[in-house]
Amino acid sequence: MVIAVDFDGTLFEESYPEVGAPKWDIINYCKRRKEMGDTLILWTCRARKRLKMAIRACKEVGLDFDYINNHTKESLKRYGRARRGCKILADVYIDDKAINPKELENDIFQNG
């Protein structure tokens, strides 16, 4: 399984442009999934110096990613080279700003 994980507010508390405190539940979940053989992608809007800060913070808590803001080799082989800024192809997206469409449907049906 390919899992794309956001940084700010997801792996670490929201503190942009700095790095917030680690969110250990999510970090440990990602570590377990990697140990199980899953592919992890760090998927963040951070760039340049701020991206390096995020990568360093992840390494300091023992979290290594297979890809950083990039598609897997299998995705590139199957779909070709993606343009910069394209959505990363993953089976699961973990992001503090995300909403599950099923939950949204339930809310719409219940609350109009």
Predicted regions and their residues:
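HAD-like aspartate-dependent phosphatase fold
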Residues: 1-112
